[in-house]
Amino acid sequence: MESGSIDLDKEIDELSRVLLEHPAHVEKVLKTVEFDKSALRYIDAILDHHLKQIYRNLTSNSPLHTLSLLQKMASWNNGLACVRVFQAIDWNSKIFIKMLQLPNQIQNSRKGNKRLKITISKKRSSLLLLFITFLRLGTPEIRLEILNSRKLTTPLFKGIYNDEPSVLKELLQCWLTYVLLDHDVSRATKLSYFNEWSLSCLASLYSRDDEIDGISLCNLVHKFFVDACTVPGEGLCFVSNGWHLQKKVDGQSKTIFNRVLQSFVFSLHVHTSTLQRELVLKILKACPDITASFIERNSLTSEPVLSYQWISFVSLLQAILGMGIPFPFYDAETRTVPPTNIIIENILPSSFSKPVVLKALNGNDKFVCFLTVNTLLASFKRLESVLDEIKRSELSEDNKVELVSKISDAILLRLPDSQTFVQLYSSTESDLLKEGLSRILLYFFTYFPENILKLKIDTSIFLRLDLSPGMLDRPFSRLHVENIIQILRYLPEVKWFDVVRSPFVFLCLMYLQTSHSKLRDAIISTLNDVFSQTIIFCPSLAVPPILTILASLQHTSPTQHKAVLEFLNSCINRCISRVFAYLDVCVDCFKKHSVNSQKKTAPEVSPISVTLIEQIPFFLQKRDISDDSKDAVLSWLSDLFSNLVCTGEDANCLFHLLENVNVTAFDSDYTLKPFNQLMSFIESLAVQKLPDYVNQIGSLSQYLLYSTNDELSNSGIQKFGMNLDFLPLYVVIITKRIAIMLQSGDMRVKKFLELIRELVEFSKEETMATSQSPIRTLLSACINLRPFLLQEQYISFNMDFAEFLIDTNASIKGSVVNTCVLDFLYKSFSDKVQENYNLIRIAAKFMLLWTQEEFIGFSKALDSFLSENDDLIYKNLDYVAPLLFECMQFTSTTNANMFSNNSISVLLKAAILKPTKLTHGMFDALNTMKPIISDFTVFEPALHTVENFDLTDCADEQILLLSSFVNFVPLFRKVIWNLLLNNKEALIQKYELLAILCCDLAKQYVAEQSQYDLERIRSFCSEVVENNLDLVLQKSHLIELLFPLMKLSDPKIQYYVKVSNALSEKYLPQGVLELLVLLQKRIDIPSSLRVQTIMRIFAILTRVLSDSPQIGLSLEKFLTNFEALIKMNVDILRDEIDKSTLNSFLESAIVHVTSFSNLRLCLTLAFTMTAEQCDSSRFLQMILAHEKNPLAGEDSSDEIKATMSAIICKLTIIGKNYTLSVLDQILKLFKGRYTLHDSLLCELLAYFETLDDISVASRYKGWVITDEYDMMLLARKDGSGVLEPKIAANTVNQYPSEWEKIDLKVFDDLETTEGLLSSYCSNEWNREVYHPLYALGITASLLHSNQQVSNIQVIVQQNFLGMIVMGLSLFKEEARFACLNFLRNFIPILDEQKFREKHLIKLVLASIIVNVPSSENRLSTLMANFYAFSLTVMMKPTHPLFVGINRYYLQRQHVDVTDIPMYYELLYPSTDYTKSVYWLLTLLHAGLQTNQDLKIYLRRHVFEMICTLYNSCVVNSEIRTLIEKILLKVVALGGGPMLVKYNAIYPMLQMVIPSFQETKENTVVSTT
């Protein structure tokens, strides 16, 4: 040491001389004296002896080398000396302020003095790099001091525009990482440092065009602002409350508000810089609370003319309005929405005022007008979103109406009058502008109908559209048309069927000319609404009339579409004007039809159908119409009437009307062939037939209706193409086709049902997505097929139709199908019609479509029928069983019992009487019904039936049901025993099923054996086992059924031989081993046979484990059972086990070290074998070196790790493998944590040190700090381990004071070892702390490896010395003696060091030595924790408690170690109340580890204090959380009743601990 100190003095003298004479060469000198090895000593020497010279150098003309020296000293070894460097120098000195102000002199310097500019810039850059180092590596206190220094902040930001790009990049990244995104830096500090002026200075960097590594500086600045200002809850951005008023912070009167960002966005150049514009939009999106004020202040100052300023203003406004509605719009906590004025300002800002809008709309520039319209559309879209949010909110309906009214009125006042937009729409020719204006008008109709409907708008202005083929392909034109269609629905008194300009014809032609689905949907929806307001069509039609009309036009030539639609339009116009006259015609037609058909119900026919037929002769008489047009109209009428008949109109009535047409009135030159074809089609449909001949099929609807069965195919459908809009019509046509086939006696309808399924799948099942889809409604309504439901002659159709409905899930509640089935069942059960029972099977199929309500409703009627008609049920069981089965299935799935006891009795007998579907259903439902069957007499009818059973004729289902009865009803057991005893031959035929029955009976035997003939049963079981043992051993799933029988039988030794011989490499069922164990317990097996069996199993497992890459679940269970077998035969195995067999097995088993059952088996073998029976050393080396050893990773469970540690300990002990190689390998696996597996290894390592003077510490060679955060490497001679200061800190706060040494004698006995291993999950263990022995040993190793200043500082700062101090609170005196001895030896080593805090550390250690004179005195956990924490505080003079703790030790040498230190000083501090109280509570929480610690807390009335504190208004949520943790720890230590009894804090405990009722009950008992 002396020579070292002499060398150091020489080096320091040399360094001093260089510093005085050549400050520029300091770095070179430091390299020559090996700066890295003794850095702290040199740094101390420089700062202590040459501080004045450093100041002189800094004030000189060339301070760059000195600044570089300070930076290197501060950054050495990840900032280990950063605090020293920072505290040694006054950074608020004018020297540094002047350096930061120098760049401002560049503007005043002479233009030609380039060298001066470079020098000035270098000085500031070097200083900034030094500050960056302090921010990165310094403590939070250093950062806070730098950030709060206004003298440095102002010149820093003032000259930042002229800084070097590389320095700016480092500075921005440092600010972002270590200030803005660091949660340890308070929000107030961030906002004070980065205020609006600072941010504006930084924003000036947007104008610089420098590049750094190919990235422009402005992009780096932009990224900095985006990360710092646009993430809610991070950086400078508070979490916004949307448009709501800001909430108050807990305990404060102020509200959180983004005021800095609000001021900052006004200073950004949004109209000239793209990046700044993007930044503003992102800030507004993250902080919607400042959007309204920004829009209000960012108003337009010039006229709305085509200028850059106008375009920029409007585009920015559109971008802001295009943002989504901020969350939450409706605040569930306050049950409010934002203030109305804020909502309105965010929808239509006042800066975009009505005069400005009117000037823009009425101006001459169409582009300005277009931009204005787009901005208004953005406002309307936001209005739409706001109103939708209001509808979804939980406000009352009255409040919703009132709020919507306020918003609508306010927005309407800010908008121009709707007349302005109507006039502009009618006068403009631009497609883009027309589309936008049409959308605005649509919004007016939607949200302000009263305003726009006051205008008398001519419908014709919306119908002046070009319907040329290319027009609808243009997106804007198509959107325009969609808007017009929506507007037409809102216009009042639209003449839809006007003869001159008919909107109906216009929309139909548009539908036929476009292929865009959205436009088509809009047209169909609009025309549906139109037709729904008239009575020209029958209301009962299955398909909307417009679909029928449009589908009928499919095969008409496009050139004739207009002629057909004009004919239809004129007929509709006539029908509407004379609808009642046509109704009279319909009534007359009804009367004649009823006479002819003798039907009671009136047939369906539409007035428009009457009109069309009436107008046929007048239309054909017109000579100005071409024959082609007439043919087209008649052909269309043929399709239309055919489709109407399929959807519900009566064909007979239509044919009757057609017969009355005056054919002689036709044009003499016109042929009657088209009309005759029309008559032929309708006549065929009227008599339920298909036409004999079809001239030409031109559409898919015609193809589906008129093509023959052979012609109908998927290829034909694809040929015509399918319009998804007409899918309901196609389905109805196919059902009509099926009805015609069924009427003619043709039952081959399955093809047509599959065709419906394919049509639905072809449409990608879009129509089946919802329960109200038209396809589901059509199918469940059973259009055209209802007359054939549940009819005797249509049974096959009903089966096919039911399966189809089930597969397509096409039924809905209350559908025609369900209603029809329910009516049929009600009638069948009430009338008791024998013929209907055959159809009940069909009805049961349809029951799968029922809802829960329909099932429950039907069950009441069924329950009554079952109770009164049991004989009828038994007689027709084959018919009614499917229906009863569905009821049982419903019962088992819904857990709802629908039947009375009488009905259940009937069902039970019916289920066991005959094997039917009911037997299956009863087996599933019986367990569900068990809790609700209170009277077991319901089983008596079934019991009488079972008494007469012949088991040889029983079906499998009946036997399974019997086994269920056995477990359910005691009455059945004796009956079934007698059945089995009298039917032994049945076991030979049906052993697998009857074995289940025997097994269930045998399980109940012990409790009820007095009721049976014991000898006869025992003989029976023995016979069953003997006759079926070979069969059972071949089928692993039957083995478990043998156990109950084996227990009741008289086993033989030959059974043991058979069972053991059944094992092989491919057959290892766990039940075989259980049988071996059972047999060994029942009879005396010769030891030679047992050894032979176990050796054979060893050989089989050796091969299996060698060939298996991993152990499966079945093999895991087998190994567990094998372990039990070995434990039963330990005595004979120790003498008889073969060494080679055992070695081979262990070698193959060690491969699977991650299997728990395998490890438990190896552990059992380790206790079974002797040192001579296996090579324990080799197997120990294999386990330690295994790459998948559970102790080496974190994936395995603690249970597996504890077992592995026990195996290592046992193999080491029995083989006496106490070698250095084994020691080093154990050290690799040893983590030193306070867990069961590490504790076992720790005791083993301690035992190593007692043998042959082996030192664990000698295996370490030193330590270094890594680049990882809070991590250090303690290197061993053959590897390295990791020390974590974080875990050391946890150890101090959660120290295991009750640690007890584990005696290695536990490994003398397997049972004791297993008892120890079962505690692996005990609350005692904690993987987040170090083991006390490890903490002592590792700290001693650190100190032994290096006693330099840096090492001593690490030991103290990183809580390693604190762990030794905590060792004084251990209950074990030997451990306390070692810790106290370490501390006594540490003080002399500390005296030899030279660092500033040395005397402070000695002050704490001296207090420990004085107040803990010997190891006999145990220090309380609380006091030990206070001492440990004091050591870390003494190393940080900037710590807020440094002054108080220092004063505490200076004022007293002797302290009361049984008291709470600094209790009142911390509870009632003069300054910084929150931090003091928080630290006191932290100390109280850490000091509460054992029951003995509770005495100190009770004596000082701690719990009364913390309860008072908890309810105080001056504490924050963190303090309350800490108080809750203290109370929870008291309850965990068993002090809950004491708190309730003596401290009366039950209400608070009940609030903190939800499940505190048990504690209260214990308190009452103890008090009593």
UniProtKB/Swiss-Prot annotation:
Any matching Pfam family: Npa1
GO biological process: maturation of 5.8S rRNA from tricistronic rRNA transcript (SSU-rRNA, 5.8S rRNA, LSU-rRNA); maturation of LSU-rRNA from tricistronic rRNA transcript (SSU-rRNA, 5.8S rRNA, LSU-rRNA)
InterPro entries with a match to the protein in the record: NopRA1_C, Npa1_N, URB1
GO CC annotation terms, alphabetical: cytosol; nucleolus; nucleus
Top-level lineage group: Eukaryota
Protein's name according to its UniProt entry: Uncharacterized protein C14G10.02
Organism: Schizosaccharomyces pombe (strain 972 / ATCC 24843)
